[in-house]
């Protein structure tokens, strides 16, 4: 009797699924979980006091909801876990490197690739060559490590993000954009001190907000006018491309 009821329910649900639109569902299943626990107010007060009110000194297990960054917070797929077993960790000539280089070159056209373990390591390598004392580096809300690597070389990180990015109640499609007027002003006044323009996509410090394709073209045009290269901190370039596809006119039918 129970089996009959289950089958009838399944058939009914299957029929309904063909006659009405089902609610949105993610296209993956979760295979692994990590335990977390809620803390008490007394515990949190004690922990933050012991950390001298510096949230960077808190232990990760003391934080129930971590909003400090979206880096390293996503689960890996079963294909990624399986790929770790196939990875070649040879000291030189690793096949893993050539696979990575092939994909990056195909996507970007760049021939020379230097893999790093983290974005801040890439910044250190690049800025050691490009940034010097007294330089000014304009961009859209430099990430904290980006700003640190610039200021650590006695240079200035100049924020040229649009003012709307600071209005938390304002909803616009591309709050991570560079303000063209601010960028133009910086280049007019300090061109000789500016080695490059950096654009972070998505704009992490401004809440992970995207940058429009139109804005990227405007930045490129202004930089070209003054003969300056444009660098991307492109940690979330795929997400930014998705937002362009969804929100910017003319890109709905473009692939990511």
Language model feature labels by segment:
Residues 21-75, 80, 89-113, 117-256:
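Conserved PLP-enzyme active-site core in the AAT-like
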Residues 2-6:
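Extreme N-terminal basic, low-complexity initiation segments
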Residues 9-16:
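Short, positively charged and aromatic/hydrophobic N-terminal segments
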């Amino acid at each position: 009797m129970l089996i009959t009821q289950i089958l009838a329910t399944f058939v009914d649900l299957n029929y309904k699924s063909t006659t009405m639109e089902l609610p949105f569902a993610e296209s993956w299943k979760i295979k692994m979980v990590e335990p977390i626990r809620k803390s008490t107010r007394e515990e949190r007060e004690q922990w933050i006091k012991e950390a001298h009110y510096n949230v960077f000194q808190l232990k990760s297990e003391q934080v129930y909801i971590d909003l400090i960054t979206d880096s390293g917070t996503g689960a890996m797929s079963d294909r990624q876990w399986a790929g770790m077993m196939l990875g070649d960790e040879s000291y030189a000539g690793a096949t893993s490197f050539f696979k990575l280089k092939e994909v990056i070159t195909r996507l970007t056209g760049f021939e020379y690739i230097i893999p790093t373990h983290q974005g801040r390591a890439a910044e250190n390598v690049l800025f050691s060559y490009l940034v010097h004392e007294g330089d000014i580096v304009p961009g859209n809300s430099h990430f904290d490590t980006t700003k640190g690597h610039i200021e650590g070389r006695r240079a200035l990180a100049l924020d040229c993000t649009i003012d709307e990015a600071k209005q938390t109640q304002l909803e616009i499609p591309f709050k991570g954009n560079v303000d063209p007027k601010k960028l133009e002003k910086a280049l007019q006044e300090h061109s000789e001190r500016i080695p490059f323009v950096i654009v972070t996509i998505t704009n992490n410090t401004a809440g992970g907000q995207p940058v429009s394709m139109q804005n990227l073209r405007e930045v490129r045009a202004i930089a070209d006018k003054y003969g300056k290269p444009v660098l991307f901190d492109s940690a979330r370039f795929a997400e930014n491309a998705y937002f362009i596809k969804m929100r910017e006119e003319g890109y709905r039918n473009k692939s990511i």
